């Protein structure tokens, strides 16, 4: 968890992704559509990507990508983010984390 905690520090939105994952692309587009400037870690482009992926599994992320943290809290993957969007709760979560101001 410490490896992930260090990557989350002082960042309102963090997305763990893989460049070949279409769901990761969809979630990145969804969040950027709100104007949120998220930090994206592409695990398949990182030397320690497999290690971070194992840490995400330990946190309960299955599948491991996309894994979204808002306000340093694990929100979940694509299903959880889409559910928040459908229930009109994603914007308020981003606002509380300081990722957007409207």
Curated annotation (Swiss-Prot):
Q: What is its main location?
A: cytoplasm
A molecular-function term among this protein's GO annotations: 2 iron, 2 sulfur cluster binding
Q: Does the keyword Methyltransferase apply?
A: no
A Pfam family it matches: Glutaredoxin
Sorted alphabetically, the keyword list is: 2Fe-2S, Cytoplasm, Iron, Iron-sulfur, Metal-binding, Redox-active center
- Claim: Ribonucleoprotein is one of the keywords in the record: no
Against InterPro entries, the record matches this protein to: GlrX-like_pln_2, Glutaredoxin, Glutaredoxin_subgr, Thioredoxin-like_sf
Q: Where is the Glutaredoxin domain?
A: 1-101
GO biological process entries: response to nitrate
Gene Ontology CC terms, in alphabetical order: cytoplasm
Q: So where does [2Fe-2S] cluster get bound?
A: 21
Query: In which compartments does the protein localize?
Result: Cytoplasm
Record-linked CDD domains: GRX_GRXh_1_2_like (cd03419)
Functionally, this protein is described as follows: May only reduce GSH-thiol disulfides, but not protein disulfides.
Q: Which family does it belong to?
A: Belongs to the glutaredoxin family. CC-type subfamily.
**Name this protein carries in UniProt:** Monothiol glutaredoxin-S1
